[in-house]
């Protein structure tokens, strides 16, 4: 006579027998499905080349304007006259390079007090 424990053993042997190998988890199948969804979405949202060209030209124009403004600013700063004593004072007191001290003085139109205040803040 079979007891409850025997029935459970028989069921386990039937499902894991040599006829049916246990199925392996399919890890990569979900990635393929995700990729298919992404490509479908990308096809729906095609980028028009005219929009892309317009965006690139806007970015290029903005960059060229920024570069031109930077060059003009550098020309203005180069026109400012600074005293050698002021430059050396800032270099020794603030312990910064000559280029940084000169830049600070030029940005503050040669005013050593304003340059020192800006460097300490």
Curated annotation (Swiss-Prot):
InterPro entries to which the protein is assigned, alphabetical: Huntingtin-int_K (IPR052617), HYPK_UBA (IPR038922), NAC-like_UBA (IPR044034)
Intracellular or extracellular location(s): Nucleus; Cytoplasm
Oligomeric form and interacting partners: Component of the N-terminal acetyltransferase A (NatA)/HYPK complex at least composed of NAA10, NAA15 and HYPK, which has N-terminal acetyltransferase activity. Within the complex interacts with NAA10. Within the complex interacts with NAA15. Predominantly interacts with NAA15 in the NAA10-NAA15 complex (also called the NatA complex); the interaction with the NatA complex reduces the acetylation activity of the NatA complex. Interacts with HTT (via N-terminus). The NatA complex is required for HYPK stability and for reducing polyQ aggregation of HTT.
GO MF annotations, alphabetized: protein folding chaperone
Phosphoserine found at: 30
Primary location class: nucleus
Keyword RNA-binding: no
Coiled-coil features, chain-numbered ranges: 62-107
Biological function: Component of several N-terminal acetyltransferase complexes. Inhibits the N-terminal acetylation activity of the N-terminal acetyltransferase NAA10-NAA15 complex (also called the NatA complex). Has chaperone-like activity preventing polyglutamine (polyQ) aggregation of HTT in neuronal cells probably while associated with the NatA complex. May play a role in the NatA complex-mediated N-terminal acetylation of PCNP.
Positions of the UniProt region annotated as Required for association with the NAA10-NAA15 complex: 52-121
Protein name: Huntingtin-interacting protein K
Region of interest: Disordered: 1-75
A GO term from the CC aspect: cytoplasm
Keywords: Coiled coil, Cytoplasm, Nucleus, Phosphoprotein
GO process annotations (BP): negative regulation of apoptotic process; protein stabilization
Basic and acidic residues biased stretches: 20-47, 60-75
Keyword rRNA processing: no
Composition skew (Acidic residues), residue ranges: 1-13
Gene name for this UniProt entry: HYPK
């Amino acid at each position: 006579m079979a007891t409850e424990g025997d029935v459970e053993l028989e069921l386990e042997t039937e499902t894991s027998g040599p006829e049916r190998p246990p199925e392996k988890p399919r890890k990569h199948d979900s990635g393929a499905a995700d990729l298919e969804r992404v490509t479908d979405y990308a096809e729906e949202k095609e980028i028009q080349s005219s929009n892309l060209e317009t965006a690139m030209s806007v970015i290029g124009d903005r960059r060229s304007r920024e570069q031109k403004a930077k060059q003009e600013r550098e020309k203005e700063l180069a026109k400012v006259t600074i005293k050698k004593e002021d430059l050396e004072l800032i270099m020794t007191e603030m312990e910064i390079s000559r280029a940084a001290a000169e830049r600070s003085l030029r940005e503050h139109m040669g005013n050593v007090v304003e340059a020192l205040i800006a460097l300490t803040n």
